[in-house]
């Protein structure tokens, strides 16, 4: 993805599949735009990891007393989160995520994502949470980048007089919040006067994050405190 400013307030967006010219652009690429030096001044890219169990038997689910389908997460900085997901063949699996990690230089792709040892600490956290499920196996594991800020919430960076707006920095809470962020981001781009655009989160930016190597050190202190 490349964004170029042309004459007459035209913005050109180029991707491997083609290009488009527009007068205004909303960048909703979250962590994948954090490599831009202006955006990354306030955004760090960290990796979130997820494990999914094989389908639970009725007896296994009864062991943990998870009778309903509520999502759960703890309140630590290095939090874990979990939810039941229904398997098409029957039964429920547990999706268990957490154990954030930082890659030097805000890497959006990291070789350790494909290594078994990367997920061992997350599996340990799962077993500490559900010691009754020591006999359950994991069928899926994956990792991906999220955009982390000091505010831990979406914000809006404006460029070229507001003709380009980057909306992101959900800090791991973007699955539901990104719908709200997109709606407010479009309002910011269109310069609409709405209750949401008057709020501080839509007008002010989070604190800056220092460059490497201090960025990596700060991430380590934050994630493993």
List each language-model region with its residue ranges.
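Active-site substrate-recognition segment that forms the wall
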Residues: 4-9, 18-59, 63-160
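Short beta-strand segments that buttress and anchor functional surface loops
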Residues: 13-15, 169
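Short alpha-helix boundary/capping motifs
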Residues: 14, 154-155, 210-214
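Beta-strand segments within the central parallel beta-sheet cores of soluble alpha/beta enzyme folds
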Residues: 1, 136-141, 198-203
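C-terminal lid/capping helical subdomain adjacent to the catalytic/cofactor pocket in oxidative enzymes
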Residues: 160-166, 170-225
């Amino acid at each position: 993805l490349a964004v170029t400013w042309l004459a007459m307030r035209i913005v050109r967006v180029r991707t491997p599949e083609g290009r488009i010219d527009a007068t205004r652009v909303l960048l909703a690429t979250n962590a994948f735009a954090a490599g831009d030096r202006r955006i990354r001044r306030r955004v760090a890219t960290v990796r979130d990891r997820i494990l999914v169990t094989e389908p639970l038997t009725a007896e296994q689910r009864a062991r943990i007393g998870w009778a309903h389908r509520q999502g759960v997460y703890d309140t630590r900085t290095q939090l874990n989160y979990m939810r039941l997901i229904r398997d098409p063949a029957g039964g429920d699996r547990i999706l268990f995520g957490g154990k954030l990690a930082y890659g030097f230089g805000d890497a959006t792709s990291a070789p350790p994502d494909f290594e078994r040892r990367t997920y061992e600490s997350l599996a340990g956290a799962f077993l500490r949470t559900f010691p009754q499920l020591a006999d359950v196996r994991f069928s899926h594991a994956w990792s991906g980048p999220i955009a982390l800020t000091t505010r831990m919430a979406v914000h809006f960076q404006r460029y070229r007089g507001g003709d380009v707006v980057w909306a992101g920095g959900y800090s791991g809470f973007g699955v539901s919040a990104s719908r709200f962020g997109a709606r407010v981001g479009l309002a910011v781009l269109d310069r609409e006067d709405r209750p949401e655009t008057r709020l501080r989160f839509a007008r002010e930016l989070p604190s800056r994050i220092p460059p490497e190597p201090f960025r990596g050190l700060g991430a380590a202190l934050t994630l493993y405190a």
